[in-house]
Design a protein with these regions (language model features):
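PP2C/PPM-type serine/threonine phosphatase catalytic domain
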Residues: 1-124
Length: 124
């Protein structure tokens, strides 16, 4: 059976799941982190969420559609967010948060948590 829910309801539930998992990782004392992607398919919508550089794509007869965008520190909006929080992005082999991490969103990564958020971006 199905419930009466909207893409916004699904997005909120997925976001809560990401943030709860992030908090659980941190509570365990985990220093490492993980990127995450989630795709929920309903009869009327495809709802894709991600944090980090895990990517969801949709293959159709006409080609491939990217459902998510990678969270890289060099992405203009991500770099602005990090800098607004007092952090920096350093270009080494690739753009890195505080010269270390090559993604700007992830679950865990306790040492950079101030700048590396678990809050997913969602498209529906």
């Amino acid at each position: 059976g199905g419930g009466d829910y909207s893409p916004d309801d699904v997005s909120r539930a997925v976001r809560e799941g990401y943030l709860k998992t992030d908090a659980d990782f941190l509570a365990l004392g985990m220093k490492d982190g993980a990127c995450m992607v989630t795709v929920v398919v309903t009869p009327t919508h495809i709802i894709a969420s991600n944090a980090g550089d895990s990517r969801a794509i949709l293959a159709t007869e006409d080609g491939v559609v990217e459902l998510t965008s990678d969270h890289k520190p060099g992405r203009e909006d991500e770099q602005a967010r990090i800098e607004a929080l007092g952090g920096f992005v350093l270009e080494l082999d690739v753009a890195r948060v505080m010269g270390h991490l090559a993604v700007s969103r992830a679950l865990g990564d306790a040492d950079l948590k101030r700048f590396v958020i678990a809050d997913p971006e969602t498209t529906a």
